[in-house]
UniProtKB/Swiss-Prot annotation:
Belongs to the MnmA/TRMU family. This is tRNA-specific 2-thiouridylase MnmA. One of its GO terms (biological process) is tRNA wobble position uridine thiolation. Its EC number is 2.8.1.13. It catalyses: S-sulfanyl-L-cysteinyl-[protein] + uridine(34) in tRNA + AH2 + ATP = 2-thiouridine(34) in tRNA + L-cysteinyl-[protein] + A + AMP + diphosphate + H(+). Disulfide bonds join 99-195. The keyword NAD does not apply. Residues 94-96 are annotated as: Interaction with target base in tRNA. Keywords: ATP-binding, Cytoplasm, Disulfide bond, Nucleotide-binding, RNA-binding, Transferase, tRNA processing, tRNA-binding.
Amino acid sequence: MSTPRVMVGVSGGVDSSVAAWRLVQQGEAVAGLFMQNWADDGSGDCRAEDDRRDAVAVCGLLGIPFHFRDFSSEYWQGVFEHFLAEYAAGRTPNPDVLCNREVKFKHFLDAARELGAERIATGHYARVTQRGHQWLLLRGADRSKDQSYFLHQLGQEQLAATLFPIGDLEKTDLRRIARDVSLPTHAKKDSTGICFIGERDFREFLGRYLPAKPGQILDPADGSVIAEHPGVFYFTLGQREGLNIGGVRGRPAAPWYVVGKDVASNVLYVDQDRDSKWMLSERLRSETAHWIAGSPPARRFECTAQTRYRQPDEPCTVQVLDDGSVLVTFARPQRAVTPGQSLVLYDGDVCLGGAVIAATDAPLEQRLRTTPSPFEVIAA
């Protein structure tokens, strides 16, 4: 068996299958590696065994070696423990970003090198290119599937060793290729959500690790009690579903939206205005930012930003602060910018990097703050 030059992360899905097929067609010495990132909890919802069988079938059809690695312990320590801690603190984390940084482009890359591969490849909808001595992360050609948002924590070493073979494809073309070459996964449904939750109810899953803690749901305008909640950590800013608020006397029969939460007092705040003033913000402060190039383009610059996946680009001004965080000022007010989620910055199709959102200047968030405002500290 020859030593592979490229190790493809085969997930058992159609995207990684086509990625592997394209590399074989290009004459690369390829092998496939299936990662198990979540230990079987008996629910059967992750379909890991089915995915593994599909990955084996794809590798067999392509005539490439198949490898398996169990990274469930690394995933638990590097991703899931942080996931739980963030929810317990009332924030809304993004485990996919951490999974890419801590598992797929760390432990998978290490395993590939141990097996003799020089580079890794994945089925992400993104592109990587070299400009001079610098590696750039670009959005995928299919903007509706672009996954650069989840890859913004990668650095130069990782990009230099990574291929994204399907980054130039539209999803419809990828499906056609998979069907035309008879890949076993050509008709397989795309996976959605977080693997360790699968098709299960999110609240039920989270409740296994964070016990219910009922409290009041209040109107921030007058403090009136609207209903009760099972735990503030089950909800995120802007959420409509799952509140289970029935008819409220004196209120119109309209949907309610989460506009804030106070973990210390165990209170959830709601409003019937989808674009409620209580959760509109013009500025955010981040945690320490990560720059794909190794450093920011300038101490102060203009670019576009996304504060959630698939959000339209929002023009903004970025100020890099002395502690490594960034202050972002948007050209227009933003709805439901959520602490714990990822801020990702772009210059056209080039992903500059990003950071975890630490705070915003939304009126309700500022009112509930018990520590000095990070924006007042900057002004001082």
